[in-house]
Amino acid sequence: ALYTELFDQRVDVEGTLLKPNMVLSGYEASDRAGVDEVAAATVHTLTKHVPAAVPGIVFLSGGQSDEDATAHLNAMNARGPHPWQLSFSYGRALQAPALKAWEGKPENVEAGQRAYYHRAKMNSAARSGLYAPEMEREAVAV
């Protein structure tokens, strides 16, 4: 319905980005979808409803943990190629680790910066389908 209306209104979708959530289990679901299931359901939905002319889809983290959001993005990109670029537009999933490390204290600024850089680096790898959970532990060991 969205893209039908955009086409009817003569919107050039080649100049747009879609910013959705991923297909996730409900908050109260006892049976949680795994990483591959989330990736498959999300890509399937996008394939059915988003025209190939849309250049990119940038995901919200939608309340996921930092690492889950990264793992899901990675799994989607690993299933590619896709007609659109799949990337991230995370707020909390990028900022929360940095804010936790910083704690509002001047002496923790560098720790907050390192935490932010680490999350951005993990998501950059996921954007290319190159993320692995082991990368999280390697960074902690440094």
Feature map (PLM): residue ranges:
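Active-site capping/gating regions of soluble enzymes
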Residues: 1-142
